Design a protein with these regions (language model features):
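Non-catalytic C-terminal accessory modules of carbohydrate-active enzymes
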Residues: 1-130
Length: 130
């Protein structure tokens, strides 16, 4: 379990890794973590966090932003490189909602999604939750 990250003699794995499994309570090696670099867990955690919590989802010809965050998150920024362009996405949450988009601006213009920009360009996206 993550609570044992500070007990390397028990965990026997680096605290920054997602291990494939942690030995259960009924085993004599309870708490020992195994196969830290032979798992897809970290990739799936990144995918879930960026695309479904922060809500930045690329598609074939556009990208959308639809966050689902704790109500006490008042703002966050995501810098996302996609197809050679840099997308600077700033999300504000003035009403403390957990989901929903009240306004969406791409480079200062109202929009409902982010079009693909040329490689090397920078795109500014402002999202207000509500």
């Amino acid at each position: 379990p993550a609570l044992q990250n500070d007990r390397i003699e028990v965990r026997e794995a680096e605290p920054y890794t997602y291990c494939q499994f942690v030995v259960g309570r009924d085993h004599t090696a309870f708490g020992r973590a195994r196969h830290p670099f032979m798992t897809g867990s970290s990739g799936w955690a990144y995918y879930a966090a960026t695309q479904y919590l922060l809500g930045v989802r690329p598609d074939f010809d556009h990208m959308t932003v639809d966050p689902c965050v704790p109500a006490d998150w008042r703002a966050f920024t995501v810098n996302r490189r996609w197809r050679g362009a840099m997308y600077q996405i700033h999300v504000t949450n003035p009403d403390g909602v957990e989901k929903g988009v009240a306004s969406f601006r791409v480079d200062g213009r109202e929009a409902d999604r982010i079009p693909v920009r040329p490689a090397g360009s920078v795109c500014r996206v402002d999202v207000v939750m509500g």
